[in-house]
Structures are given as C-alpha cells and as structure tokens.
Design a protein with these regions (language model features):
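Short, acidic/turn-prone active-site loops that include or flank metal/cofactor-
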Residues: 96-100, 123
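Short, well-ordered beta-strand micro-motif
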Residues: 107-109
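His/acidic metal-ligating clusters that form di-metal
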Residues: 1-91, 150, 176-189, 228
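Short, solvent-exposed aromatic-acidic interface loops
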Residues: 119-130
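Short, surface-exposed coil-to-beta transition loops
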Residues: 101-105
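Short strand-connecting beta-turns/loops that link adjacent beta-strands
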Residues: 87-88, 100, 112-115
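Non-catalytic terminal accessory segments
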Residues: 38, 129-297
C-alpha cells in the first residue's frame, strides 16, 4: 500500500472517531484474503496469475489498513461473493456481481457502531431480462449459416428467469474461458470429458465407484469449483451433497496413490474445494466489532 494513501485513511478514520461517526470503507479491490485460504493450492497448481491471487493483499498490507483505522471494508471488481476476516480485526466483504452465476448485491444495516448486519439479495426475477433474446437468436443463426460453431449454448434462450439465464452464462464462461485459460493441459486432456467413475478408475483402479458417478464428468466438477469460488455460500445449496461426497472420494483416492502431474493437480483441486466449502458466513451475517466475530443470521 502507498504510504500517502495509508496516511489519508488514518486521517479520515481519526476524524470519524473524533466526530462519533461510523466509518465504512469501499474500495475497488479487496483489503484481505478473498479466496478462503486457497491461494496456496492455486499458485502451486495453476500459477501466480490465476483466480486473481495477485489481488490478494499481503498480511502486512491488510494489517496496515486495519491499523490505519479500517475495520469493515467492502470490495468489488472480482465478481466474488465472500467474507474475509483478518488480523485483529478487519472484515472484508466482497460484493457479488449482478451477472454472476448467482447474481446479487449486499445491503448493510448499521445497528450501532459495533454491530452491523449484512444481507445478500439475490436476483431471480428481473423484468424484461429476455427482451434481447430475439437478437441473440439471430446472432446464433447467423453463425450457423456461416458454418461457425456458436460459442454460447442455445439453451440459454429457454431460460425461465434471470437466475437460470445467469447459470447458462456462467456454464458457457467456464467452457470457453475458464477451462482453456486456467486449467493445465494434463487436466483438460485426462479428466474434462471423463465421467466420475472413469476418473476414479484412472486414479485408483481398485476403488469402488457408485453407478451415479457416471452421471457427471470432469467438466461438471471444475464448473462446480468455479461456482463455489465465485458465489460461495450462494451456490452451495445448488450442488447436491451426494455429488460433493463423490468428488471427495476422488480427492481421497488421489491422496493414497503415488504422485504424478495428474495426481498433483487433483490433490490441488481437492484442496481448493475444501477451502471454498469452509468459508466464513457470506450470505446473511452479523459483524460484531466488539466481540471481533462474524456470525451467520
């Protein structure tokens, strides 16, 4: 952080305290970890440029912001729904996007200077969300007429509400952007198109797989990983626990066999899932600055 910015923050925080004002900070980027501790897995498996980990401030910067007088900070830009707690005591609330897989926004209610409620409002119904679908259909038909493969799924135009449309949009973003740009070749080649039973057999040939593991494939697993990373608790209820248990079966198997480039990647994915599934409350919660804790409501 730049020293003159920290000095300015301290000046504002001191003035707020002197005038008995409640200070809430907003910034384009986060003031604390927003990846639920998953950066170590991301950097090891995918590199330092993935999942915006270069936007994760160092502990020294987070501590400096807190020491300057900021205890509650709202960040944007990353399209991530998350709550990060750092130091003694700074709460970083990442505000979700209105166009993410679970679109939404935050409402902050200040009960008193020490106690605040954060509510996350999700957008399921949006008036006229489909008003441009006719134009999208023309674009799709035009690409087909030219012999080009459309980059997005036509099923999106059958969406009954805005939430469903965003689901399709995010699935296509996963397919055409996230996987090609973020996922190492060994994963793209060996698990993306294999179903769950095949992935388990590839890792541990003697392991027993449930028949239902053939109902999903490696793409679905990566898609769920991206959904959890971006929407956190908001998407947790959309992923069946049975599916998560089957993912864990694969991750556990990877931890029992000899290391290889593929096995190391699967272990890393398991670590990321573990972090994203064990995050701080991020939907509706109370910030208690007096007790230095965040609790779900």
């Amino acid at each position: 952080a730049r020293n003159h910015v920290l000095a300015w923050i301290k000046t504002i925080a001191t003035a707020a305290k002197q005038k008995n004002k409640t200070l809430i900070a907003f910034c384009h980027f986060p003031a604390a970890d927003f990846n639920d501790g998953a950066d170590k897995y991301i950097s090891k498996c995918w590199g330092e440029e993935k999942f915006d980990i270069k936007r994760t401030p160092s502990k020294e910067i987070t501590d400096a912001i807190r020491e300057a007088g900021i205890n509650v900070h709202f960040g944007g830009h990353l399209h991530v729904n998350d709550t990060g707690i750092s130091g003694d005591f700074l709460v970083n609330v990442q505000v979700p996007s209105l166009a993410m897989c679970v679109p939404g926004y935050k409402i902050l209610t200040i009960n008193d200077p020490q106690h605040m409620d954060v509510e996350t409002v999700t957008l399921t119904e949006v008036p006229n969300f489909n008003s441009l679908f006719g134009r999208y259909q023309k674009e799709y038909d035009h690409d087909l007429a030219l012999g080009k493969a459309p980059i997005w799924s036509i099923e999106a135009l059958k969406s009954k509400n805005y939430q469903e449309f965003c689901n399709w949009h995010f699935r296509d973003v996963t397919r055409v952007r996230f996987i090609p740009r973020l996922i190492p070749e060994v994963l793209r080649q060996q698990i993306t198109d294999r179903n769950g039973k095949e992935i388990l057999a590839l890792i541990a040939p003697n392991a027993t797989a449930e028949d239902s593991m053939s109902e999903w494939n490696g793409f679905d697993m990566l898609h769920d990983l991206f959904r959890l990373r971006y929407s956190g608790e908001l998407v947790r209820g959309m992923i069946p626990q049975t599916r998560l248990n089957q993912y864990n079966k694969i991750f556990d198997a990877a931890n029992t066999v000899a290391a290889s480039p593929l096995i190391e990647q699967i272990r890393g994915i398991g670590g990321m899932f573990g972090c994203f599934l064990n995050e701080e409350p991020s939907i509706n919660f109370t910030i208690d600055l007096e007790q230095k804790k965040v609790t779900a409501r």
